[in-house]
Amino acid sequence: MSTNNSDIRVVVGMSGGVDSSVTAHILKEQGYDVIGIFMKNWDDTDEFGVCTATEDYDDVIRVANQIGIPYYAVNFEKEYWDKVFTYFLDEYKLGRTPNPDVMCNKEIKFKAFLEHAESLGADFVATGHYAQVKKVGDEIELLRGVDNNKDQTYFLNQLSQDQLKKVMFPLGAMEKTEVREIAKKAGLATANKKDSTGICFIGERNFKQFLSEYLPAQPGEMRTLNGEVLGKHDGLMYYTIGQRHGLGIGGDGEPWFVVGKDLKENVLFVEQGFHHETLYSDSLIATDISFTTNAAKPKTIECTAKFRYRQTDTKVTVHLREDGTAEVVFADPVRAITPGQAVVFYDGDICLGGGTIDTVWKNGAKLNYVG
């Protein structure tokens, strides 16, 4: 790089975890002008001490002091509520299964946070995501992280060129074990901290209990597709396509799985057997299609896709439609595609972009996954 790194200001999103701690440490070691920012996205004052925000910020302070960088906490609660949490609840009301991580990256970490960082004179923002960016001509490509088990491009699929041109992912070329090793060698306070899992604003709390605080549950009948009533469900929002646990159906034979929802009648459909035919589909319609590059796209794209995080890729043909949606046709049937989740497109290691799964189809007929 022709410019001296000390002239380049990088604002790091620090969560109090090991990944973002090592990100800040690496950039500081490389001579960048580094500032750490802790994003406070959720108001935990009305909770019962479960949220770890204060503890996490203490860890940010400890690490920032260890590596010698300034740090701040910035409140994005309003933006998070408006852009992420409201979407989260709206999707559940529609009987779908949302992906708040995708929306958080699009609207908070690489929008509200990026704008704030720029107000501090940032040339780039950096996070602890396991993904890579690569300049090719005038464009920035988003590439999978080297650690296949940790690759997070699935959650970054909605990022635009304007956002990608401003980001650094120092951990993208590393395995998670290397990151822990660096943290230990550097003596970082978070070196042995457990990775956070699940949805950040729910934390360790019971999911059903949390959701019922915001959306009234409406119990109803649990039926087979032939109309046989097998019991009661606790509320359609608590169930997702392909779910097995928590159905409370006894008896012998193969386990039961969720195969559909009827919102109007408030009925949950279940069938027996992991490989029940209703769980398999051959295509889907996706909305909110977004691409990571500005290059012109052909109407038909042959690529691979992921329908959930850490799933192996499936060969697909994507047909872009005039209304901004896409029909995604699978080379082989896929099990338990879930409306509301992200479908993400890849060309080898390049993440092309993605969209939101809206409807799921088989042999030209729409499956009643949410209807």
Curated annotation (Swiss-Prot):
SUPFAM superfamilies: Adenine nucleotide alpha hydrolases-like. It is an enzyme of class 2 (transferase). Disulfide bonds join C104-C200. It comes from the Bacteria. One of its GO terms (cellular component) is cytoplasm. ATP binds at G13, M14, S15, G16, G17, V18, D19, S20, M39, G128. This is tRNA-specific 2-thiouridylase MnmA. It comes from Listeria monocytogenes serotype 4a (strain HCC23). Belongs to the MnmA/TRMU family. Its EC number is 2.8.1.13. GO terms for molecular function: ATP binding; tRNA binding; tRNA-uridine 2-sulfurtransferase activity. Residues 99-101 are annotated as: Interaction with target base in tRNA.
